[in-house]
């Protein structure tokens, strides 16, 4: 894990600069008075979804929506006011061409179309829920692998395979979306496998060209297998702590505070029980998020420290009347204006216990935030697929527009990590790729084959998990 830890530590040293993103975190005094007190109350009240409304009512809701976004949306300046102004103009022009009675479904779809720049790059954001899944399916990246097609890697970094005693070296792929990635198999071997990580529409048939020492070429077709997330009811807690002969298994599928607070507090405390383990399997597959305070507390308990556990980032909280009303009072000092921005420099922690974190593309929001927090520890390996990619804008709220009942969801806090690249709908790549549905069995086989823990411990833990 030495090379992986070096990579994680290097990532921690990158903090997006407030100067580089000055436009995205700028103060906007004009936005402070965009919503009246009655409009704020109306947004927070909740309204029934309508089938049709008058043109005047539709226009009123459109105006309210765009003023609400400017006032309270954490990524408003990140995308830029000119894009939102153009979107509002497009919807307004469309309304002017319609009959006096407006179908709410048609309006919702038009809003989605005009705000595609936002919805395609902010996974938490939602405008008009009935068609939200269709939008996500178009912009979501998927992980495919060429099952049964494996390479080895030599000391020079070349990928090759041996057929009938002859070495064939990777020359090229037919598709720019294809790459070679370290991949964990069910028998515990780590190989190098052709991997396609792309939008579903780009998952086309591909080929690979190999060459021997004399330059002779062979072309093979690559048949893609789509990876599968863990089959689990999303949003359930499913907290488990299983320990056997030095092997610790921890699973948690949600960090949502409220209903499960007592169990989450227990989970956080029991991080201490993993101390002294020979290895820890930390299963975050299917963890849809909630509050990242819980994984922070687990890590503190595991390390035996009260020091802050932070990933390096730049964050900017939008201070608005809507935010203040929803939270009873503003959480920000008045002298910060409409935007409170800070650079956070993460801290690296030494740790000699191997921690293998299992992820899939349902691991999102503070679920994948937990993955990033765990990467501030030495000896951590992330195994599975890409995470979900719900990172750009957090502290999520849902509102309904008063006349149409159209649902609106967005966050008030902008988060930028590493080099500032937006990972929404793409997620974070694992250190070692593995079909998530097989990740647990594959990791148990790896630990057994490497002699980290006993075969009996692996089998006992597996049996207890499937019970």
Give the residues covered by each predicted segment.
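Flexible, low-complexity junctional segments that flank or bridge functional domains
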Residues: 1-280, 286-288, 297, 395-398, ...
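Glycine- and acidic-residue-enriched helix-capping/beta->alpha junction motif
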Residues: 267-268, 272-340, 375
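Extended C-terminal subregions enriched in glycine
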Residues: 354-376, 381-389
